[in-house]
Amino acid sequence: MEIFVWCLMPSHLHMVIRVQGYKPELIIGRFKEFTSKNIQLAVKQNPHESRKDWLVSMFEKAALESSNVKNGKFWQAGNHPIELWSPDVISQKVEYIHMNPVEAGLVFEAHYWKYSSAIDYSGGRVVLDIDYL
């Protein structure tokens, strides 16, 4: 999987990726499974997490509402991969993804959001290795 653009928001994640030989839905499902298990484990094992009990109860409540999750649920059901078929569409999606924190009022400029590839595209420090578009 190649990651070109990403932005982690408080309630969701956006990515522009390329996968070859696999359906994007399968890759996203595996990604969600892996990260869900590890995030929940990190919360449960962190003695300094002040919201631990509340978070764990929310994971468990979400799992009860799902037919296919048993031990806690982190991500919403489903995913929404779309094919980016032209340079104009790609540019529009990159702009939309990077501007998400600005539109949400979390930062004044996209490259200030720590959890985004916007800083990489502005020449700043690298948080996650990406493949540039």
Segments and roles (model prediction):
Residues 1-133:
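Short catalytic/metal-binding and nucleic-acid-binding patches
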